[in-house]
């Protein structure tokens, strides 16, 4: 049985979703089915993290370190994650492993950008001062599809963290387990509490919220 990750802890829910092996149509595992209340808790946790400044005001070099550590942790679980993703999604084991490696590369790529988010200053003449500063949005909510869940999750999660945003991710009901392996690896990097939250629920309920 797999859990949601909210506010720095793996948590269960009253209801469960069944995840089936598409090759056999047989049940593979269950995962906690997040409710609207769970989604709200995740959003509030992300907002607290953003408001605390631990992530949004962290020095760029610190965010670089976090993202590189995340990439290392993802590579370390690539074989385990590939087996999980293969069973729940129907990919070949090689394609599933490549998806985890691709996820790690996204974090490596955006680690290289995390300390290069620069403002601009345009000289407009006497009496004018013109400059642009980029600030984190605060909270990024991301809904991930079933077909490339690990890769697509990393593609949007990595830049959000690089820019200093806290994130709430809704995983797909059909193949949420590989993303649990992904987040378990990410957590080891030591991000601030509430920086990343993972929930699995029905799109018409949790996703719509």
Question: PLM ranges: what are they?
Answer:
Residues 13, 39, 78, 96, ...:
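Alpha-helix N-cap/helix-start motif
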Residues 119-209:
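Rossmann-like NAD(P) dinucleotide-binding subdomain of oxidoreductase/dehydrogenase enzymes
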Residues 1-31, 62-65, 69, 101, ...:
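Terminal low-complexity tails and localization/encapsulation signals of metabolic enzymes
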Residues 22-24, 36, 160:
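Short connector loops/turns at beta-strand edges and beta->alpha or beta->beta junctions
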Residues 26-117:
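Glycine-rich loop-to-alpha-helix module at the N-terminal edge of alpha/beta enzyme cores
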């Amino acid at each position: 049985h797999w859990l949601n990750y909210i506010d720095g802890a793996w948590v269960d829910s009253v209801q469960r979703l069944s995840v089936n092996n598409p090759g056999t149509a047989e049940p593979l595992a269950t995962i906690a089915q997040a409710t609207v209340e769970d989604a709200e808790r995740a959003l509030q946790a992300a907002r607290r993290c953003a408001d605390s400044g631990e992530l949004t005001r962290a020095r760029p070099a610190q965010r670089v370190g976090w993202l590189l550590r995340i990439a290392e942790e993802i590579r370390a679980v690539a074989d385990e994650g590939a087996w999980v993703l293969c069973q729940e999604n129907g990919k070949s084991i090689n394609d599933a492993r490549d998806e985890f490696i691709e996820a790690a590369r996204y974090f490596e790529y955006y680690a290289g950008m995390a300390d290069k988010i620069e403002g601009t200053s345009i000289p407009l003449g006497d009496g004018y001062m013109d400059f642009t500063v980029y600030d984190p949005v605060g909270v990024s909510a991301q809904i991930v599809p079933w077909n490339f869940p690990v890769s697509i999750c990393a593609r949007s999660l990595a830049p959000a963290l690089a820019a200093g945003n806290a994130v709430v991710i809704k995983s797909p009901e059909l193949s949420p387990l590989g993303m649990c392996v992904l987040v378990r690896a990410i957590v080891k990097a030591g991000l601030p509490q509430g920086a990343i939250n993972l929930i699995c629920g029905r799109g018409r309920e949790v996703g719509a919220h």
